[in-house]
């Protein structure tokens, strides 16, 4: 009987959620994670990521794939999103003070209520973005 229970436990799918120690990847769950160091995330693929409430101040996300990601109420002060793809992502209520979005794909991004003070959008695609 014990071996059957052990077998069932081993065969059941894992329902664990991703944590703050998980490597950046598509669909990563970094909800409310606090990254206090300057993270180097150049060119990472994090499409469909769940990062609501994340702290990525000073992070370098240049050339990253963040399309369809939830970045709402996140902290991105001085973050570098240059040449990144954030197509259809949610940055509602995010703090993007002094963030660099130069040459980024921001089409259909929701910036409603976001702090964009002194952020740079030179050459960015803002087609249907909600500012």
Residue ranges and their predicted role:
Residues 13-15:
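N-terminal signal peptide c-region/cleavage motif recognized by signal peptidases
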Residues 18-131:
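Tandem repeat scaffolds
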Residues 9-11, 21:
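Sterically constrained small-residue positions within well-ordered secondary structures
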Residues 1-8:
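Sec-dependent signal peptide recognition
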């Amino acid at each position: 009987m014990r071996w059957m229970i052990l077998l069932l436990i081993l065969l059941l799918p894992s329902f664990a959620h991703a944590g703050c120690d998980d490597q950046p990847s598509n669909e990563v769950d970094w909800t409310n994670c606090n990254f206090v160091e300057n993270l180097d995330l150049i060119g990472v693929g994090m499409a469909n990521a769940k990062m609501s409430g994340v702290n990525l101040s000073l992070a370098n996300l240049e050339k990253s794939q963040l399309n369809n990601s939830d970045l709402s109420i996140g902290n991105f002060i001085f973050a570098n999103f240059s040449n990144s793809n954030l197509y259809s992502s949610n940055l509602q209520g995010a703090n993007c003070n002094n963030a660099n979005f130069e040459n980024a794909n921001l089409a259909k991004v929701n910036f409603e209520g976001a702090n964009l003070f002194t952020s740079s959008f030179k050459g960015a695609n803002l087609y249907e973005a909600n500012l």
